[in-house]
Design a protein with these regions (language model features):
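Feature marks short, surface-exposed loop/turn motifs that line or immediately flank catalytic pockets
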Residues: 181-182, 251-253, 333, 735
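Divalent-metal coordination cores built from histidine and acidic residues
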Residues: 168-173, 178-220
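Short, solvent-exposed turn/loop segments enriched in Gly/Ser/Thr/Pro and often Arg
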Residues: 175-180, 190, 246-254, 794
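Bacterial N-terminal signal peptides
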Residues: 16-28
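Intrinsic-disorder/low-complexity accessory segments
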Residues: 32-171, 212-213, 218-219, 224-226, ...
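Ala/Thr-enriched low-complexity intrinsically disordered regions
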Residues: 10-13, 435
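Proline-aspartate-enriched helix->loop->beta-strand connector
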Residues: 235-250
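N-terminal secretory signal peptides that target proteins for export/translocation
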Residues: 1-11
């Protein structure tokens, strides 16, 4: 009856013993908690076709689970941009909840690795619990993430199976709905149709994050948005998870999802335990998919995701020693089809278990997401102690590297070695590299002389032990903003309590110090050091493999902050900055008889003070020439504010709150001055929202510029000069000089939603700028005295207006026509470049003669010799020599001597053309002045101060 001995029944005595043992064990295990299921709460199961739960419903449900389950605690972690409360569910066993504060402290101590011996770390790792962060819904239209989180929390609060109970005992789960505003917006939009079959996520009328939409996953080192700040605080200051899992959509065509491991390159600054830890966690996911009979998971070459870039929710974790997991899965409450793609049916290393083409329902995607969640929780449970200890090791390694001479080997290092070898070979008359037999590059199995290896470790090229941000730089308030960005990401920053000397240089009290000897050293390095992205091509002469996001982003460069790299260990009168800080109060140097006050144009926050003055009806003048008063020289661009009680009150507050120095003068300056005045600023936007416009919107609000949004129908109505002084157009707003029938950019969302289906409040946003109707009206606006600021691809207005600029990034095709340079010849993805400036030009006043600009395959021009005679003046340009500062520039020679920012006179008005990303994601504070100056200089009148 039982031919297979594996299935033979156990003896009766053994069964009785096991029954007693299980009974005793049951007394010690938490009972299955009686909690409300999603179906009982909402009337449908999570993943049912045509059904969604919005954020308001999610919070109400989680509050109920919090009351019903002793496994869950619901906490508030911040507010959203629209004012909703962000929540986080903390799920673990009741016994762990009783010691939650202790386990949180254990995770923090291991993550920071400060003053902790190896034995002490092992003891804490044995005591602690693995902390796993799982979020959902960051990109709200990728609706699977938020919905699966509801299912996961219910299963973890109700499950009584052995695996769930083990996980609850070993792991603390942090479950976070990452975009509450977006979830309410998208779910409500989808459900607005009474007829389920008509429901669609297409055509959402606004961005699903108030300002930046999809870019909310590009904000995790800058922390500009309240949601990002809240999550960064939990990740890097409060909880320090060892693993974070960031759900996204959608999967590559013909698959169900992409899951790690990722393709190369990974970043050279983070710990090797990051990529191998990723492999460990990823293997558990793929193993579970296959074991559960869930085909369709691809990895590595299956999609373009990598671990190079810092700035996403998942990717910023790597630079904080967290294993960050991303999945991109298919699925929609409206059923979809997995298409038949023949090549996808063939198994391979990166796609071992193909999925058949089929109709796909949302519930299937929910189950896949839960499988991925459980795989991560399971591996965290089984390797609990290892994950905790490895987090300590990564922090310890970072501290050690920052405490001694160390070198980060990057592609440029290897290129220098190869160049040295090649040079010596040529001098010796040896064959050129690659000509010899065996090995790569002709080096053979024996490699090359070790002297080349030893040359890598030149003392002058070592990594810094730390960075000093001097307090006496012109725009110290912006430097303080950089420091706050670091602090919000968990970086330890110190401040000098007295003046001090390091490496032969004196620094004043109040200077900031960032030591490299800290656990988050990888993050520190990417904020101050240039990125050196490899030349990434599939084969010699082939097109470049695009990086997942930016290739270079060094934040200190982007923000224009002065800092010194300190190569040797140093100390001084330093104290830790305990949290986000303000710049020291500025000086208000004005006696009762002062005629007025000078403000420094080099300081970005001066624009806040000017905007407050103008809003209050006070006057301000922008001096066209330098001026000497009371023994002090004030450069061209200085702001002069005539004395009045109102102006004094505003400027005293600005000095205190913003750190501005307000310098009084006994007499008023003389000479020419621009007169900034309250302006009517229109910022282009479109139905569905523009992220580029949203970033400008956010930026204008931070610096207190007045503005209103303007949509295509309002532009087409004409009469623009009566409504606006300044119009701002961002990338995606202006159509190319058209080939007939070619669609303009900027219409995301509308195509799938007929006008009859658009709510009345949004109908005035429908439409697009056209060459036939809108462009002539824009020209009339400028000719009548208006000002246009055109950013990125909107600079094609120059071509529409017939201005004498030519595209610098073209070559002659064989048929004699111009064609854009192919990426095999020229390719500069998101990188920082060094540019020259004419600081005497009003558009550039307050800037130095050289600046760093963010360039992302953006426009560049050449000017004919008579351009200035025709009213076109260069303001910022690329010089000869090396341009790349951080990132990847293939064929950068094509950019040399090209114009990056220009002013053009058109009739009585002006158009300013900005090729680089001068406001990119709220990061390049060093180029904000180009935008702000344009807003005030464009329509300003010139007067003579006497």
């Amino acid at each position: 009856m039982f031919p297979n001995p594996r299935f033979r029944p156990a003896p009766r005595t053994v069964l009785v013993g096991l029954a007693i043992a299980f009974a005793l064990l049951a007394l010690r295990l938490p009972a299955a908690t009686a909690v409300t299921s999603p179906k009982d709460q909402f009337g449908f199961a999570i993943g049912d076709d045509y059904q969604l739960v919005n954020y308001k419903q999610l919070v109400a449900y989680w509050k109920k689970l919090d009351a019903e389950s002793d496994r869950m605690s619901l906490v508030e972690i911040g507010k959203t941009a629209e004012g909703r409360t962000m929540v986080m569910a903390i799920i673990t066993s009741p016994a762990n909840h009783a010691r939650l504060g202790r386990y949180k402290d254990v995770a923090r101590r291991l993550a920071l690795a400060e003053g902790l011996s190896d034995a002490g770390a092992r003891k804490l790792a044995a005591e602690g619990k693995a902390v796993v962060w799982i979020d959902g819904g960051l990109h709200a239209t990728e609706i699977l993430g938020s919905q699966q989180l509801i299912e996961l929390v219910w299963r973890m609060t109700s499950g009584a199976d052995a695996e769930t109970l083990r996980i609850l005992d070993d792991v603390i789960l942090l479950a976070v709905p990452a975009n509450p505003d977006g979830l309410d917006l998208v779910a409500d939009w989808y459900l607005r149709e009474k007829e389920p079959s008509k429901r669609s996520m297409s055509g959402v009328p606004v961005l699903y994050q108030k300002y930046i939409g999809h870019d909310n996953n590009r904000d995790f080192y800058m922390n500009t948005q309240p949601e990002t700040k809240a999550m960064s605080r939990q990740l890097y200051i409060e909880w320090h998870p060892q693993i974070l899992y960031n759900h996204h959509q959608t999967g590559p065509a013909g698959t169900v999802l992409f899951a790690p491991p990722f393709r190369d390159p990974f970043n050279y600054v983070f710990d090797p335990l990051i990529p191998v830890g990723l492999d460990l966690v990823s293997a558990s996911m793929h193993n579970r998919f296959v074991t559960e009979g869930k085909p369709g998971a691809t990895m590595r070459s299956g999609a373009g995701y990598s671990t190079w870039w810092n700035g996403g929710l998942r990717s910023a974790g790597y630079f904080h020693n967290i294993i960050g997991i991303l999945t991109e899965a298919i699925g929609n409450p409206t059923p979809v089809d997995i298409p038949f793609i023949p090549d996808r049916l063939l198994p391979k290393q990166d796609y071992p278990y193909p999925v058949a083409p089929q109709k796909w329902h949302f519930r299937q995607s929910i189950e896949y997401a839960i499988t991925a969640d459980m795989a991560i929780l399971d591996v965290a449970s089984k390797h609990r102690e290892d994950f905790l200890y490895r987090r300590f090791l990564m922090g310890k390694h970072a501290i050690e590297l920052g405490s001694k001479d160390s070198w980060t080997i990057v592609p440029g290092t290897i290129a220098e070695v190869k160049a040295a070898v090649e040079k010596d070979r040529k001098a010796e008359g040896a064959p050129a590299q690659g000509a010899g037999p065996g090995g790569r590059g002709g080096f053979g199995r024996g490699g090359v002389d070790k002297k080349y290896y030893e040359a890598i470790f030149d003392k002058a090229t070592r990594d810094p032990r730390g960075y000093i941000i001097p307090a006496d730089q012109a725009d110290f308030p912006t430097a303080t903003k950089l420091v706050n960005v670091l602090i919000e990401s968990g970086v330890a920053v110190e401040r000098a309590t007295a003046g001090f000397d390091v490496a032969g240089k004196s620094y004043p009290k109040g200077s900031f110090v960032v030591k490299a000897a800290q656990a988050f050293r990888p993050h520190v390095m990417t904020m101050f050091e240039p990125q050196d992205h490899p030349n990434d091509f599939p084969y010699p002469g082939g097109p470049p493999n695009p990086p997942y996001d930016a290739a270079g982003w060094t934040l200190a460069y982007q923000m224009g902050v002065a800092f010194d790299r300190i190569l040797d260990g140093f100390s001084g009168p330093f104290e830790k900055v305990p949290g986000v800080t303000k710049p020291p109060a500025g000086r208000f140097e004005a006696g009762p008889g002062a005629a007025g006050y000078f403000l420094d144009h080099r300081v970005n926050d001066t624009f806040i003070a000017v905007n407050r003055l103008l809003k209050a009806g006070e006057k301000a003048f922008w001096l066209k020439s330098g001026f000497e008063a009371d023994g002090k020289t004030h450069p061209a661009g200085t702001i002069w504010v005539p004395a009045s009680p109102g102006a004094a009150a505003i400027l005293q507050k600005a000095a205190k709150d913003l750190g501005l120095n307000v310098i009084g003068a006994a007499g008023a300056p003389k000479g020419e001055a621009f007169v900034p005045r309250p302006l009517r600023v229109g910022l282009w936007d479109t139905y569905g929202g523009s992220m580029a416009s949203g970033w400008i919107r956010w930026l204008l609000e931070q610096f207190e510029f007045p503005y209103e949004l303007v949509f295509a129908p309002a532009l087409d109505a004409g009469g623009l000069a009566e409504k606006f002084d300044v119009l701002i157009f961002v990338g995606g707003s202006i159509p190319r000089v058209q080939v007939a029938g070619q669609e303009a950019a900027g219409m995301r969302g509308f195509q799938q939603t007929p006008p009859a289906n658009v709510p009345e409040e949004f109908k005035n946003r429908i439409g697009r700028i056209t060459a036939e109707k809108t462009i002539p009206l824009l020209r009339q606006f400028v000719e009548a005295g208006g000002t246009i600021l055109a950013l990125d691809s909107a600079t094609v207005l120059a071509e529409h207006f017939g201005l004498p600029l030519a595209n610098a990034l073209v070559e002659m095709a064989q048929d004699g026509t111009e064609a854009p340079l192919r990426p095999e010849k020229f390719y500069v993805p998101g990188s920082i470049m060094r540019a020259r400036v004419n600081p005497a030009h009003p558009l550039a006043q307050g800037l130095a003669e050289t600046i760093d600009v963010f360039f992302d395959n953006t426009p560049a021009w050449t000017l004919p010799p008579d351009a200035e005679l025709k009213g076109v003046n260069p303001v910022v340009w690329f010089d000869d020599g090396k341009l790349l500062r951080s990132g990847w520039a293939w064929g950068e020679s094509y950019l040399r001597r090209s114009v990056q920012v220009a002013e053009a006179a058109v009739g009585k008005g002006k158009i300013f053309l900005y090729g680089p990303e001068i406001a990119f994601r709220g990061q390049p504070h060093g180029t904000f002045k180009l935008l702000f100056n344009g807003i005030y200089y464009g329509p300003a009148k010139t007067i003579i101060l006497e």
